[in-house]
């Protein structure tokens, strides 16, 4: 059986490799492995998300962190951020924590199915949601996210237009104070929803 990147305990054979990623004016080396999302490089959607963000402050949650490029690169760019990275995938969480530390970034890396093991409030939550898990799963994540945002806190998501960005925007507008598209690039929409 093949593992999905949102499998909690991947059983696929390890295939560890090192890649270099440049974004936000910083460059970092990352270890990746089989059984995690986009193990060969920073995926286009995540790059679009990263490059569309305003300057960030406070406490940040990288929800569905994978091998940790978002939290690590943001931590390198904004060293005063308090960063929590989470993923349902145990292999991804281990890689994310190691990658952050190897690049001099202090983070808390937590294995969690959405918010199951996440405590506290966040000023910013970022996610490239697991589209293949289905609309019910990702909309549930979006709804639960609001309860973990400070007043005025922001959720940033990246989603392909053809994979449901218009309906996700509509849903977010119905449940958040505001929601808007802040970037459209290469078929991806970056949506910011404010609690």
PLM feature spans:
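N-terminal auxiliary segments of SAM/dcSAM-dependent transferases
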Residues: 1-24, 34-39
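Conserved SAM/SAH cofactor-binding pocket of Class I
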Residues: 44-127
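Class I S-adenosylmethionine-dependent transferase superfamily signal
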Residues: 74, 145, 172
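Short beta->alpha hinge that forms the Motif I/post-I loop of the SAM-binding pocket
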Residues: 87-90, 137, 160
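A short glycine-rich, Lys/Arg-flanked "PGG" loop and its adjoining helix->strand segment in the class I
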Residues: 139-151
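Conserved beta-strand signature within the Rossmann-like core of class I S-adenosyl-L-methionine
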Residues: 152-160
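Conserved class I S-adenosyl-L-methionine
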Residues: 160-175
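Core SAM-dependent methyltransferase catalytic element
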Residues: 184-195
């Amino acid at each position: 059986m093949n593992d999905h990147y949102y499998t909690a305990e991947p059983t696929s054979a390890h295939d560890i490799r090192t890649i270099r990623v440049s974004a936000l004016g910083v460059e970092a080396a990352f270890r990746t492995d089989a059984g995690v999302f986009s193990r060969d490089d920073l995926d286009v959607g995540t790059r679009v998300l990263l490059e569309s963000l305003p300057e960030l402050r406070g406490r940040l949650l990288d929800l569905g962190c994978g091998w940790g490029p978002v939290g690590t690169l943001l931590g390198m760019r904004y060293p005063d951020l308090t960063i929590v990275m989470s993923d349902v995938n145990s292999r991804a969480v281990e890689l994310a924590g190691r990658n952050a530390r190897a690049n001099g970034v202090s983070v808390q890396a937590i294995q969690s199915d959405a918010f199951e093991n996440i405590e506290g409030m966040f000023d910013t939550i970022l996610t490239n949601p697991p589209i293949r898990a289905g609309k019910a799963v990702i909309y549930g994540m979006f709804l639960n996210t609001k309860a973990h945002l400070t007043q005025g806190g922001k959720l940033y998501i990246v989603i392909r237009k053809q994979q449901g960005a218009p309906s996700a925007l509509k849903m977010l507008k119905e449940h958040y104070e505001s929601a808007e598209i802040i970037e459209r690039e290469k078929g991806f929409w970056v949506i910011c929803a404010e609690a």
